[in-house]
């Protein structure tokens, strides 16, 4: 009975979304995107698309999303949004981070990306435009990937903080007590593999088109660079997402080294009480600010 009710609710919700979608004006970018997509399919092999296409998407998005935070350090007005104001970025740290990123991206992540083609072939994942999912199904699957990744990240991240293994792996990521956007993927190679597994679990379970790979990469990079940005920007649209952790939540993890282990959402930290020091810190800070007003 419960299963039938769940299916009925899902079907009703799906029909409602489809109805709303039918009322929306036609997307003027759809035709150019369709032409570009078909051009790609006609001029490149699936291996080239899945491997080199995925690498280009990752690198272009990663450094594009890092750019605003990088520029903020040169804009005096933005300093008031810096979370740890006493720890500005340094050229030395950023250059060190950039070099490690290049190694991780091309020596660790690229071999993993090469497996994307074989994954799509084994599971018969389509590439063609005709079978590309509607935007609402794509968003729903990306949300599912985010929930899965966040769950994996919370427990594996917490494990990496265990006193017996922290200094061997996760300590690398904590070299910079005040994070900055480019540091999001600054990590020990083993950590890249361990925490990165959470990214792929959702893909294996939910992928129904190669576009999901790139959509999920886009959302995951946007989120992880945002929480590592070191800035709490007002009117950040990501903060509209229910239970979204945000930059202040993860910045405290880097400052305190303990607690706030989740990557995207706040529920696991809330359930296991690993956000208690975070809330106590900001309550104390609010009281102090009121006294000094």
Curated annotation (Swiss-Prot):
Give me the segments passing through the membrane.
Answer: 55-75, 100-120, 199-219
- Which biological process terms from the Gene Ontology are attached to this UniProt entry? cholesterol biosynthetic process
Protein keywords: Cholesterol biosynthesis, Cholesterol metabolism, Endoplasmic reticulum, Iron, Lipid biosynthesis, Lipid metabolism, Membrane, NAD, Oxidoreductase, Steroid biosynthesis, Steroid metabolism, Sterol biosynthesis, Sterol metabolism, Transmembrane, Transmembrane helix, Ubl conjugation
Q: Where is this motif: Histidine box-1?
A: 157-161
Q: Which cofactor does it need?
A: Fe cation
Q: Which InterPro entries match?
A: Fatty_acid_hydroxylase, Sterol_Desaturase_Related
Known EC number: 1.14.18.9
Subcellular localization, as worded in the UniProt entry: Endoplasmic reticulum membrane
Indicate which residues form the motif Histidine box-3.
249-255
Q: Which GO terms describe its molecular function?
A: C-4 methylsterol oxidase activity; iron ion binding
Q: Where is the Fatty acid hydroxylase domain?
A: 145-274
> What GO CC annotations are associated with the protein?
endoplasmic reticulum membrane
According to the UniProt entry, where does the motif Histidine box-2 sit in this chain? 170-174
Record carries keyword Transmembrane helix: yes
How does the protein associate with the membrane?
Multi-pass membrane protein
What happens to this protein after translation, modification-wise?
Ubiquitinated by MARCHF6, leading to proteasomal degradation.
Against Pfam families, the record matches this protein to: FA_hydroxylase
Its annotated pathway reads: Steroid biosynthesis; zymosterol biosynthesis; zymosterol from lanosterol: step 3/6; Steroid biosynthesis; cholesterol biosynthesis
The record's catalysed reaction(s) read:
4,4-dimethyl-5alpha-cholest-7-en-3beta-ol + 6 Fe(II)-[cytochrome b5] + 3 O2 + 5 H(+) = 4alpha-carboxy-4beta-methyl-5alpha-cholest-7-ene-3beta-ol + 6 Fe(III)-[cytochrome b5] + 4 H2O; 4,4-dimethyl-5alpha-cholesta-8,24-dien-3beta-ol + 6 Fe(II)-[cytochrome b5] + 3 O2 + 5 H(+) = 4beta-methylzymosterol-4alpha-carboxylate + 6 Fe(III)-[cytochrome b5] + 4 H2O; 4alpha-methylzymosterol + 6 Fe(II)-[cytochrome b5] + 3 O2 + 5 H(+) = 4alpha-carboxyzymosterol + 6 Fe(III)-[cytochrome b5] + 4 H2O; 4alpha-methyl-5alpha-cholest-7-en-3beta-ol + 6 Fe(II)-[cytochrome b5] + 3 O2 + 5 H(+) = 4alpha-carboxy-5alpha-cholest-7-en-3beta-ol + 6 Fe(III)-[cytochrome b5] + 4 H2O
Q: What is known of its domains?
A: The histidine box domains may contain the active site and/or be involved in metal ion binding.
Q: Any idea what job this protein has?
A: Catalyzes the three-step monooxygenation required for the demethylation of 4,4-dimethyl and 4alpha-methylsterols, which can be subsequently metabolized to cholesterol.
Q: Read off the PANTHER family from this record.
A: STEROL DESATURASE
UniProt lists the family membership as follows: Belongs to the sterol desaturase family.
UniProt name for this protein? Methylsterol monooxygenase 1
* Encoding gene per record: MSMO1
